[in-house]
A protein has these predicted regions:
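Charge-dense, helix-prone N-terminal extensions
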Residues: 1-112
Length: 112
């Protein structure tokens, strides 16, 4: 995982670390780092940080139903109960109760 973070912007890494702490707090979550992203797994990978950029991180959370929010950039529906919800985090204040609810929904999806 440290290889993935190496060379990334300090601000982006700080957002990642905050998101990671919140994602790990929703339950029995395992980090699943890969070459192009860092996943969060509970059964299945239910969330991932797909990019760490200067001043933002790009994230997705998989849920049983599409998330209806202006914060969601795009939803990929892979099946009746598999919806990949993409959004960005551009400030620490955006890692809020709404994101925690989405992570909990993803966590439940992970063992579904």
């Amino acid at each position: 995982m440290e290889d993935y973070l190496e060379g990334k912007s300090p601000a982006g890494v700080a957002f990642y670390r905050e998101f990671e702490a919140v994602a790990l707090s929703v339950g029995d979550v395992v980090l699943a780092p890969a070459k192009t992203r860092i996943g969060f797994q509970h059964g299945r990978i239910f969330a991932a940080v797909n990019a760490i950029r200067q001043g933002r991180i790009d994230v997705h959370i998989v849920t049983a139903r599409p998330i209806r929010s202006r914060r969601i950039r795009r939803v990929e529906s892979l099946g009746a109960s598999d919806h990949v919800n993409h959004f960005s985090i551009e400030s620490a204040s955006q890692i809020d109760e709404q994101v925690i609810r989405w992570l909990r929904a993803g966590y439940r999806w992970g063992v579904g």
